[in-house]
């Protein structure tokens, strides 16, 4: 995994951890796909999922937008998924 991918995963962790009531249960997994894109999977305590999603999905959309912007600076595609 490249430094950029690690930086984006750390960005996700720094954005998600302050949002939740159970920060010890935040898990960020990143995997480089065959096409070179990055898949980031966010796992949180089930009670915290709503906080990460936000009203009408605004929070998770904002996280996805930031990650895509960070990846596009280096010509890389980034997908962010919240796993329940």
Please annotate each region the language model reported.
Residues 1-49, 62-84:
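RNA-contacting regions in translation and RNA-metabolism proteins
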Residues 53-57:
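Glycine-centered tight-turn and secondary-structure capping sites
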């Amino acid at each position: 995994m490249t430094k950029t991918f690690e930086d984006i995963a750390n960005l996700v962790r720094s954005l998600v951890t302050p949002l939740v009531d159970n920060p010890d249960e935040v898990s960020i997994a990143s995997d480089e796909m065959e096409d070179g894109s990055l898949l980031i999977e966010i796992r949180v305590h089930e009670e915290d999922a709503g906080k990460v999603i936000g009203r009408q999905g605004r929070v998770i959309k904002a996280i996805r937008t930031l990650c895509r912007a960070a990846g596009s600076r280096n010509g890389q595609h980034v997908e962010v998924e919240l796993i329940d």
